[in-house]
Amino acid sequence: MPRKIVEPAVPLAKPVSEIPGGSIAALKRKARGCRACPLWKPATQTVFGTGPANAEIMLIGEQPGLREDIEGEPFVGPAGQMLDRALAEAGLDRGMLFLTNTVKHFKYEQRGTAKLHKRANAAEQAACRMWLAAELARVRPKIVVALGAMAAQTLFGNTFRLTRERGEWRVLGEHAVGMATWHPSAILRGRERKDAMYRQLVADLRSVAQRSQ
């Protein structure tokens, strides 16, 4: 008998067949045993979300990098350092936010001794959707910020285009609003547009801060 598709009471663009329950700590323990896609095999560990379980604001990134894979926490590498600076400039306290990623394992390509970041494919993103849904259902944030195109399309659908719709507020279900902005890692790769993209990130985060007041 096919599994019933349940429309989640969470703001995701696509339905999730099953949403795990429990506290954030319990969800983190459950996620360690996830074998829904092959990314767990080469990864050091699952990188689950972190922050207050009743946070008003949730920031959703794309996928862990090398430092996150080693330390087991989201946004602790170079992109996380840039995010910390942008949050401070925008007047947001990182300790009051719930930070997570769309995908919970580090995907990489081995080049000699180096592990080079590789984007998770659609099937891998879909396999992780239940964990993001569980985080959203448990935290129930009022404001959701997608950092990067992967997170934005997970929230707003595959037709969403970050270059056109960045910084625009959208209604997410009955209880939340959301917006998308640049992922700090994209800014780090931005070269000649780096400064402009960073200013836009800070401006968008200031809009988040104002909305939360």
What annotation goes with each model-predicted range?
Residues P2-Q213:
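A polyanion-binding, active-site-adjacent surface
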